[in-house]
Amino acid sequence: MASEVDRSGRLAALLPRGPGHQFVFYGDACSGLPGLPHEKTFAAVNGVVRRLEPLPEFVLFLGDEIAGLTADAGALRAQWRHWLDCEMAWLDRVAVPLWNTTSNHTTYDAMSEAVFREIFADLPRNGPPGQEGLSYWVRRGDLLLVFVNTMWSGLGGEGHVETEWLREVLHHQRDARHKLVMGHHPVFPINGFSGAYQREIGPEHAGPFWDALVDGGVMAYLCSHILAYDVQVHRGVLQVCTAGAGTAHRMPEGVEYLHCAQGALDGEGLRYQVIDSEGRVRERLSWPLQMPPVSGWRSVPAGVSEAPLVGAPCDDRIVLLRFQGRAAPAGDGTAQTLLAAFDPEAVGALAPLWVGVCGTEQRLTVVVGPEARRSPHYWHGPSLAPGQPFDLQIVLHAGMGPGGLLWRASEDSPWSSLTAASAWGVERLGWPTHWSVGHASRGPSDQPFRGGALVVSSALSEVRV
């Protein structure tokens, strides 16, 4: 959704529903150099933060505040001083604390790590040995904030992060009702931009790192680095990337935009809104998802039937699907349809939405093709065991972009985003008039499901924040 632009008026901040916390998080300005373009773009985003009513209780900046990347310590200090004393002078950092993470533009060698410690001398020195002032944690009542260093030179530099200390902090602070972890690099690829160490945390760290978040009951990992806004969920924990604070590039261009994010935590969960540099609310999320019980979902008949949701693309709808059945025997890797959405009047057109299994491993696959004669995009999930029963739930969340195609194995299991290399999701999909269960749009012989006892049910919900 996008709100009307009012460049002079106040912007309503999301507030906790009862006791809680409200805050701003953003990253990647690459400024600190007076008179250069990023000073102007960063000022535009800060202008939006300054219009929030009320102002945030604290601000999380997720790295790449300055251009940095210089061998001259004096020049690096000067960039930091300009960023703090000029570009962020509007923020009363006594009333509204500012906490920062390390990043590739700011802590790229031993010298720059020392400058970071010097500039942010007031940050807690409670990190792991050797990382004091680079990794740290803060407790605000029932809220735990942990800041990890994804640039730790002692492990190898960019894309390397320590995990044992993180696990220990989460364990010792386990009484915190709300837990957020902040770092610069994502763990999971974003918008198809992928590369170990340079674009996301290295593979030897990524698994233990995410295990620590899941085991520690963390609500979200907030990161930046990839110049985009993106949200995914993996085993019930959100990865939220916000890297639009001023850097003039986009990943990809034409899709992403300058922005900040403002959020609220309370007893019901996390809500946030993503606001562009003109003050429009462009995207939003409330987590955990609120949805009707599975027992109340509507049965979808086998074969072709009218679709329960028809119309133009929208970003405020959630489609819930449940697939039960027995997987086909092993051996044949051709595609099998669970559900296809299509318009019979669109002669010769491929189904804009297809859900099924592909390959000899019978991997859950969702195909979304909103534009005729353009290659569709693919999302992949778990494999089905040949000949065995399965019960899968899928969410198509039009407010979550590419991370909004989710799956889980049961009502008690955590949600995870399907894997994709797309920069968009079902928000681009015009919803066709008909659904078919057990075969694709051209009839019973078109990519049929070869297993047995297929039962499909569905429900609709709306994005609410």
Please provide the spans of the model-predicted regions.
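A short C-terminal boundary segment appended to hydrolase-like catalytic domains
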Residues: 6, 261-314, 404-405, 419
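Flexible glycan-contacting loops in extracellular carbohydrate-active proteins
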Residues: 416-454
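Short tryptophan-centered beta-strand motifs in secreted/extracellular beta-sheet-rich domains
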Residues: 388-398, 405
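Extended active-site neighborhood of metal-dependent phosphoesterases/phosphodiesterases
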Residues: 2-11, 36, 70-178, 195-220, ...
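N-terminal active-site segment of His-dependent metallophosphoesterases
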Residues: 1-77, 190
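Short, aromatic/His-centered strand-loop micro-motif at the edge of beta-sheets
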Residues: 368-391
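A carbohydrate-recognition surface predominantly in extracellular/luminal proteins
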Residues: 311-329, 349-354, 454-459
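Glycan-recognition/cleft segments
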Residues: 340-367
